[in-house]
């Protein structure tokens, strides 16, 4: 019975709020990076969005080992995509300003693609050697 109620909650409350919060966050990022500090606007709205979505869907998160990350050190973080919440967990709980590497097709998602472009996320295009080379060049410039 609890599972059924949770599914109803997800469908009629969680999902609509997820869409609305995603659009609002994408607009914040897009507008904020255009008129202000890209370092702040390219990360913090997404950070708050990730935390809020996890709370909205009642997903408990426990982070271990974050204290082992050195403040001025660069890292590569890899999500295994074994669940549908890893993006929210990384954004909401990693507490590191970072850049995503994502399929270039995601650029076509309304609002989200715009926000990713404005916040200089790295779009991976594997449609040929020249596109792959350009992806590496873009990544080098952004990072």
Residue spans of the language-model regions?
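Soluble catalytic domains of membrane acyltransferases
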Residues: 56, 60-143
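A transmembrane-helix-recognition feature enriched in membrane-embedded lipid enzymes
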Residues: 1-62, 114-115
């Amino acid at each position: 019975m609890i599972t059924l109620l949770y599914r109803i909650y997800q469908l009629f409350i969680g999902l609509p709020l997820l869409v609305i919060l995603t659009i609002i966050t994408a607009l914040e990022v897009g507008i904020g990076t255009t008129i202000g500090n890209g370092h702040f606007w390219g990360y913090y709205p997404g950070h708050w969005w990730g935390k809020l979505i996890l709370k909205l869907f009642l997903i408990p998160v426990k982070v271990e080992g974050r204290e082992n990350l050195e403040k001025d050190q660069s890292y590569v973080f890899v999500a295994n995509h074994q669940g549908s919440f890893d993006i929210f967990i990384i954004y909401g709980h990693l507490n590191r300003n970072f850049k995503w590497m994502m399929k270039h097709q995601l650029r076509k998602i309304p609002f989200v693609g715009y926000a990713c472009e404005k916040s200089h996320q790295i779009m991976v295009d594997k449609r040929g050697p020249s596109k792959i080379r350009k992806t590496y060049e873009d990544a080098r410039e952004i990072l």
